[in-house]
Amino acid sequence: MTTIHTLGYPRIGAQRELKFALESFWKGASSEDDLRATGSALRARHWAAQRDAGLDFVTVGDFAWYDQVQQTAALLGAVPTRYGFDPAQLTLAQSFVLARGNADHAAMEMTKWFDTNYHYLVPELTPDLLDRQWGPGTEWLFDEVREAQALGHRVKVVLLGPITFLHLAKARHGLADKLALLPQVLQAYTAVLQRLAALKVEWVQIDEPALVLDLPQAWVDAFGPAHQALAAAKGPKRLLATYFEAASHHAALIQSLPVDGVHLDLVRAPDQVAAFAPWSADKVLSVGVVDGRNIWRTDLTRVLAHLTPLAQALGDRLWIAPSCSLLHVPVDLSAETKLDDELKGWLAFARQKLDELAVIKRALVEGPAAVQGELDDNRIAIASRTQSRRVHNAGVKKRVAAIRAADAVRAAPYPARADAQQARLNLPLLPTTTIGSFPQTPEIRRARAQHKRGDLPALDYLQRMRTEIADVVRRQEALGLDMLVHGEAERNDMVEYFGELLWGYAFTANGWVQSYGSRCVKPPVIYGDVYRPEAMTVEWSKYAQSLTSKPMKGMLTGPVTMLQWSFVRDDQPREQTALQIALALRDEVCDLEAAGIAAIQIDEPAFREGLPLRASDVPTYLEWAARAFRVSASGVRNDTQIHTHMCYSEFNDILPAIASMDADVITIETSRSNMELLDAFAEFAYPNEIGPGVYDIHSPRVPRVDEMESLLDKAAQVVPVQRLWVNPDCGLKTRGWPEVEAALQGIVEATHRLRAKHANAKRAGSKAAHVEGEMA
């Protein structure tokens, strides 16, 4: 009989119970026993959901207090040495020190989990780990297995695989080769598998998503010996799981591994199963056919047509699952109160995806007639979405199709634009500015919430926001900044604010997903063709500009970021949706210009996040992503200055694409790297203007003036001073006014000092500046 299972389930709870329990514990408002009780209740509820839906196993090992990669490290005994903690006795409080840091220890580094919006804690591998035996680590996994078994569940354990674990880790303090630690890692995994066998666990899902990547040969070669060692452990049966992309380029390797089954993601790569034919007669094939990363209902008719031949060929050896862990989607659609019935009928959250698996299984095992009602309901929902006028707008599609090459190019090259912009803006050498947002006080948040509930009339809300804007403008002028912003008091979130004003977007009430630890996000839903019914920011920026003679930046979120931080429709290429958003933003940019706004910032913090996992797919993505930005920005005159902002730790591999965006000014996060990120821009000879951040807004610490002056000196050594701007690393929304004003005062003072050192230099925008810039 066909087996159905899930690779993982959301851990936060339908009402974000884990988030609130964690934050209560961290504040000292509740005990560790209280926190553990919440975790136990959530696990029991989630296992019951899997059982009640008819899954053949419940998945154990997907729960984590903060992050599953950190918990894997704790299980293996791979706690970073610098903390001085005993791996075998690691307490819950100590595990939070690893994740969050304290006065004595910096937190572990955090980065994106493959190409998702989830963040994991990066394991730290140091040379001293070569000389010690790994394990035993903490007992959490075995405790949770016993917990599930005590509730009567049939258990399948999920465990991050050894090669992916090492690949995701970082070598530190001179460790030359992460793979040198493979023997220690395998020793620990062997002990874990043997413990699981003693607990009568039937199956262990070994997650090796690194197999979808372009791996160096040494890493490819490591899979064979590693999984031979796991096989020798005589543990439970092992299901090797790959996801997020095709693993077909490693098909021969995967087929050779001594595992009992393999999971393939057929949502991201539906054709890859052919590369594995003929399937081994003694192995299970698990196919991921329900999308674990998006919120749309599965087209069950299409999936069954695909699976029926596989079911006939494999029989009981066919397993069915989501494409990946359901960690990346909200928990339960039944908790959703904000969406209308039509749109809600197109969606499936984690709990509903379990039900979809059950329908697929019954249709394959008992025949479609056994679930005819469910299949008919699914067909109606799929047809409704396909044919809905809310989804399809002929005018939007026609406008995208009509985009010409000239629509994605500024009227003149940068040097000519720089002349026109300097003539209009008359900026000094090393102009000072900020990234956009200013502190959001409790009063600001309260006014927004009251207005949203209908408790604060529109005119009263407008006046309160105008008062905040006037205060922000006054403070910036008093500080002596050169280019001002309005402060974004009216915005709760840089994507949600615009999404609420664009057609084609919808917002859930409880569509929360975990980003990391206790941080949850509620991505908007792009369900249809996107267009702008009316101006979104013009009146705010126009009012702010009326208060000052200094230039005021308009502030927008770019098309790629609007795309990346949303649940995106899956019925057309992402490029098309990005271009629709770009055209909506283009209209806003042109309206801002017409209202007298001379500088417009189009933020793209998620530009790099969209990079595909496979190198062969990267050029296509970068081409359309940069084009979408240019479409949004290229409708303005030469004397209107276009800014963008990005915050990454690595630019080298995407610098040509960033240059092709052709923003007049790019501001970047550099203070934490001590300006080292600028080296890449210098080596590439980035042609336009750059604003390297000199103040780390993520820290409450206010840097000294001499520190910021030193950072600017370093910046001026790698980028011509004529093209340098001075700014913080990022927006100031989360900081308090006292530290913000102190830091900005320091920025202005450091800038004055640097201007004195370069008194003879000319700003970009004069012929003399072009010559000097070329000579620098």
Swiss-Prot record:
Enzyme Commission number(s): 2.1.1.14
Active site as annotated: H698 (proton donor)
Matches recorded under CDD domains: CIMS_C_terminal_like, CIMS_N_terminal_like
Known pathway: Amino-acid biosynthesis; L-methionine biosynthesis via de novo pathway; L-methionine from L-homocysteine (MetE route): step 1/1
Catalyzed chemical reaction(s): 5-methyltetrahydropteroyltri-L-glutamate + L-homocysteine = tetrahydropteroyltri-L-glutamate + L-methionine
A biological process from GO: methylation
The entry's keywords: Amino-acid biosynthesis, Metal-binding, Methionine biosynthesis, Methyltransferase, Repeat, Transferase, Zinc
Residues annotated to bind 5-methyltetrahydropteroyltri-L-glutamate: R16, E17, L18, K19, K112, R519, C520, W565, E609
Residue positions binding L-methionine: I435, G436, S437, E488, D603
This protein's name: 5-methyltetrahydropteroyltriglutamate--homocysteine methyltransferase
Organism the protein comes from: Ralstonia pickettii (strain 12J)
Name of the encoding gene: metE
